[in-house]
């Protein structure tokens, strides 16, 4: 006999069924509460008292006894008897009766439950609507028991069916709990209509409305509201289905009424939405009057014959006709009397308040307009910065952004009437013959002034033209030469280190270049001086910004020290050629540093002595030691080995031999071929005190390229630099190193992730050791799985025994390709043709 296949019982005999039998649970529903507990914060592990309503056969009680703390009180109740379970109190009772409530109080005594579970369902089979309503009633009874026995911030988990009463139950839950969420765990079958609601944070109200837990009040059918007929009239294209059925007693789908009833009704919209046709009685006296209207056209007659096919425009036409018909029949009287509006004059306080409000509104609009303008300027500035459009024209942009507060606002000066006063400064430069005759000291030769002015202007024009031509040349060269473009981006190879300037000398030079002309008019002088002061501040600000860009961090750190405040810039700035600094500047600076330290030490000792003598007289003053000096005194107590070690480390960090000339000099110093005095002597040359101030850029760059010292180099130095560069080039590029590092990081992260997963698998007590081993081995196979590599194609030369062979050659496995001399010549010809075309491009 053949085997009979057992029915699957609507999919209940799935993996959860067999897993429940393996774990020893009484039903597959135990995995539902396990998954809900894991999803919502492991509330069972924190529960000391648990009540399971409708608990048969007891699978949820088994899970609770396993997850809850030791010595927890777990009570299970159902209408059918259950087999006893360890650590669980079970009894038989109906949860809708008073007997169940009294037994629960007897077992719990003065305790309150932390969690109430409900997984009950009624006997089904009467019909879907009846079964869903009975389930909702049962859920409400379970909620009633939970409200009586739950502790504050307790948890309630229940099962409900998807039905029309679902939203009503959710509303009741939300009145009693802080957080209400509906979920469907994976263990619940998809074909089942059940869903689970998790209610957390029980509010425990002191006074509870009994209607909130009364099934008659909660599930009461509310009467439907009045049907919205306006949507039918003003949006007839959108059809709304009657999902709740048709009205009781309305057995017909076709309705008609008289057109005069439509005119007399107070709710024409509803009538238009309900009726299919308006009938006309030709013998009616009122219709004979309305028939003579010019609005009663043939189109109107055809529209009222079938109202269900009309559109929005047709319905509006019918409503306008009804309005005119009501006026003619006297049903609706048109109010032609115009209401007279009495204008009451404002009082003085009201007028002031109105004007104040107008000014405030005007000020608000001005502020809003100014804010919008500033935002637009910021957006344009950001766009220019993103497009690298940062050029010297930014000065003009900044000046334009000042708006009304700009430096030269001639419109404001013209409105205020002081434009002529502002021009008096230039008017005073023109002297009359009488003034020249009165004062013999004042004599101006106009011809000489014009001649000098023309020659200076020509020189300035020529210089600016040369600078513009040179900038155009650099732009063209950077477009076609990538190396030159990279050099410009780096800022040049031989960029000198800027050491700062003295503010006093700069102010002296600016004062020497200024010419002030006295003016008898005080207001004119004051206006001109303000303008000159603003321009001077702008120029000094721009120069300061340029200096900040050129000043290196090392020089800034040195010159910020207070001891350099009164030092004049009397040291020459030596140029740096090919990465080697002249020895004279190094020696002079080191000597000056030593001398300055000795002078500072003597000065501090003198100040200390003088302070002791004058302490009685000048007690208000206090001499604070410099931080740098304290560091020097602290360093005296260090050992010589630590000093030497720090000096060596600092020396090794600062010096880097990067050129052949520097390597040659290092070899000569190491071999004793040169000493300090030789380096000092070499520092004195014609390039040392070169004056490069106020020279154009094209001249300076040409001098850097051609006018420089050619120092002798050796073969050994060149080989050493070559080996150094070779070692640097042998290192992987930044992208390759970063890619390798990322690969290692991903591998480590993947391994850590697998370790965590393996730990979770080991900690899962619900799985057997065999399942754990299989899952861990599956994870390890994913990590150790090697990427698939394409099989190599074997090349077989079509010569000898393989010549003219139709099938697979002997001894060749996998993919293969037949090649011969003709194919080789063809490939060579193709490469030659491609190379030829590449040269033409």
From Swiss-Prot:
From the UniProt entry, list the residue stretches annotated as the region Disordered.
Answer: 480-534, 565-654
Show the ranges annotated as biased composition (Acidic residues).
518-534, 608-621, 629-641
- One GO CC term on file: preribosome, large subunit precursor
Q: Which GO terms describe its molecular function?
A: rRNA (guanine) methyltransferase activity; rRNA (guanosine-2'-O-)-methyltransferase activity; rRNA (uridine-2'-O-)-methyltransferase activity
Q: Which organism is it from?
A: Saccharomyces cerevisiae (strain ATCC 204508 / S288c)
Q: Which domain of life is it from?
A: Eukaryota
According to its UniProt record, this protein's enzyme class is transferase
Q: Which family does it belong to?
A: Belongs to the class I-like SAM-binding methyltransferase superfamily. RNA methyltransferase RlmE family. SPB1 subfamily.
From start to end residue, where is composition biased (Polar residues)?
574-585
The record describes its quaternary structure and partners as:
Component of the nucleolar and nucleoplasmic pre-60S ribosomal particle. Interacts with the snoRNA-associated proteins NOP1 and NOP58.
Q: What is the lineage of its organism?
A: Eukaryota, Fungi, Dikarya, Ascomycota, Saccharomycotina
Provide the alphabetized UniProt keywords. Coiled coil, Methyltransferase, Nucleus, Phosphoprotein, Ribosome biogenesis, rRNA processing, S-adenosyl-L-methionine, Transferase
Q: Which reaction does it catalyse?
A: guanosine(2922) in 27S pre-rRNA + S-adenosyl-L-methionine = 2'-O-methylguanosine(2922) in 27S pre-rRNA + S-adenosyl-L-homocysteine + H(+)
Indicate where this protein resides in the cell: Nucleus, Nucleolus
Catalytic residues, per the record, are 159 (proton acceptor)
GO BP terms = maturation of 5.8S rRNA from tricistronic rRNA transcript (SSU-rRNA, 5.8S rRNA, LSU-rRNA); maturation of LSU-rRNA from tricistronic rRNA transcript (SSU-rRNA, 5.8S rRNA, LSU-rRNA); rRNA methylation
UniProt-listed Gene3D superfamilies: Vaccinia Virus protein VP39
Keyword S-adenosyl-L-methionine (UniProt)? yes
Q: Which residues carry this modification: Phosphoserine?
A: 455, 464, 529
* Pfam families in the cross-refs: DUF3381 (PF11861), FtsJ (PF01728), Spb1_C (PF07780)
Q: Does the keyword Ligase apply?
A: no
The entry's protein name is 27S pre-rRNA (guanosine(2922)-2'-O)-methyltransferase
Q: What does this protein do?
A: Required for proper assembly of pre-ribosomal particles during the biogenesis of the 60S ribosomal subunit. Specifically methylates the guanosine in position 2922 of the 25S rRNA at the stage of 27S pre-rRNA maturation. Also methylates the uridine in position 2921 in the absence of methylation of this residue guided by snoRNA snR52 at the stage of 35S pre-rRNA maturation.
Segments of skewed composition (Basic and acidic residues)? 505-517, 598-607, 642-654
- Residues recorded as binding S-adenosyl-L-methionine, renumbered to this chain, are 58, 60, 78, 94, 119
Q: Which E.C. number(s) belong to this protein?
A: 2.1.1.167
Regions annotated as coiled coil: 360-389
